[in-house]
């Protein structure tokens, strides 16, 4: 039996590794239908047409000593999950009932967007430093689990 979780998580990792626009972190996300077909991929980076941190040679968050998992508005990068949802929407591809494979646990902003987009399950590879206080109700309505490599 094929290990679909491993297969799709490896693709999400490859998407993250191909990201050269963010100096600080590389995240990848993948949206997958129930029939195991890939809807879209996304990685964290600057919006289209905007110079990335890699191109500028510095990270605004690093320069201003902003901790990971805090003050998301201090960076204009689009998160991997957000990009995956945006690319699906741009191409008119429904996401309701899909699974999101992502290389790190979604931040609270991405969690809300994934719930609103009808994602049925989130499978993440690593923990993310953001505290989720107050988001228990939102997290309770979407299936979420950490990827198990066993």
Residue ranges, per PLM feature:
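Zinc-dependent deaminase catalytic domain
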Residues: 1-150
């Amino acid at each position: 039996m094929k290990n679909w979780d491993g297969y799709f998580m490896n693709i999400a990792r490859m998407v993250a590794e191909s990201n050269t626009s963010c100096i600080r972190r590389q995240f990848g996300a993948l949206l997958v239908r129930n029939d195991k077909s890939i809807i879209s991929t996304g990685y964290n980076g600057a919006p289209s047409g905007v110079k990335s941190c890699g191109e500028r040679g510095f990270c605004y968050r690093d320069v201003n000593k902003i901790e990971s998992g805090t003050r998301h508005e201090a960076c204009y990068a689009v998160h991997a999950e957000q990009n995956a949802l945006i690319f699906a929407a741009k191409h008119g591809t429904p996401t309701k009932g899909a699974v999101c494979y992502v290389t790190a646990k979604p931040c609270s902003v991405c969690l809300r967007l994934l719930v609103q987009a009808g994602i049925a399950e989130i499978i993440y590879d690593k923990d993310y430093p953001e505290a989720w206080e107050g988001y228990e109700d939102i997290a309770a309505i979407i299936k979420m689990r950490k990827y198990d490599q066993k």
